[in-house]
Amino acid sequence: MQFELLSTSAGARRGRLTLAHGAVETPVFMPVGTYGTVKAMTPAMLSDVGAQICLGNTFHLWLRPGLDIVGAHGGLHRFMGWDKPILTDSGGFQVFSLGALRKISEEGVKFASPIDGARLFLTPEISMQIQTVLNSDVVMIFDECTPYPATRDEAAKSMRLSRRWARRSRDEFDRLENANALFGIVQGGMYEDLRDESLGALQDIGFHGFAIGGLSVGEPKDDMARILAHTAPRLPADKPRYLMGVGTPEDIVDGIANGIDMFDCVMPTRNARNGWLFTRYGDLKIKNAVHKADTRPLDPSCSCYTCRNFSRSYLHHLHRAGEILGSMLNTVHNLHYYQTLTAELRDAIAADRFADYVTRFRSERATGAH
């Protein structure tokens, strides 16, 4: 893995991340393909909207279809028909999401399979082994996502467990001679000094990139902004910086302003399937009756396949009728919007006009999609 910092503007960074399956221009938004597919999108459609890298989910792919199946294809790229880079999360967040169904110990996490109830055990070592079979370009360490709310003692205990798991993840990654990139994840809840302690330990271990985890897990926006503003500038400047699970277009712009390079979130795809569409001039809900006879495109400034060919009225009809095509066209548009946003931000940083772009972005988004 190689990361080049190409330019900066008002704290924002323009870079290039070179991975085993290609180069990724940053800042970058990564669509989420939990089960080896970005919902309602073919790989060709994903490429057409400008996606450079996508996510796979270690936890879910381990459970179904299983490592033997993916391994028989030589890894996740061939299995899902995607020849560009893939990042896999470690399974830590999914285990965290199981709540009472899981039991965390020093060794790892015991839990009941959400598919068939089978008793399973996931450890840092097993997570690294799974991700090595998946052959993802970026591997994430196995950590515990600190819940919100958490007392200081709870956050400290969770972070220090993640710190020990980070060491074990690194050791197993090296033992496996995995030639891909391994990212560490900074935890520590809503406590700045715990975030600093986590980052220091991760730097001592050594990773190819650094992520901020444990945000956008239910905390108030002010707390998220505070921890992001504190933590992001402290991440190593010569390594890629990744804000996990974030977020809205505004969240992404705020993250980039704080020096973040990489983002992922289910929001554009999940919202698309629910008829919530993002545009340059605000968001709209296509199910609303106001769109029933509206012959305009979603966004006259958008060049996506959906906006070039279909009206709001047709998309409203598809959504009301429950047609699969509605989810597909909505997802094409939302992902194209996110990819266009990050492409424009890359250009603005390169031209040293990031602050001007953000001012215009906020003004346009505030007008409301009419």
Swiss-Prot record:
Keywords: Glycosyltransferase, Metal-binding, Queuosine biosynthesis, Transferase, tRNA processing, Zinc. Residues 245-251, 269-273 are annotated as: RNA binding. One of its GO terms (cellular component) is cytosol. Substrate binds at residues 89-93, 143, 187, 214. It catalyses: 7-aminomethyl-7-carbaguanine + guanosine(34) in tRNA = 7-aminomethyl-7-carbaguanosine(34) in tRNA + guanine. Zn(2+) binds at residues 302, 304, 307, 333. GO terms for biological process: queuosine biosynthetic process; tRNA wobble guanine modification; tRNA-guanine transglycosylation. This is Queuine tRNA-ribosyltransferase. It comes from Azoarcus sp. (strain BH72). The gene is tgt.
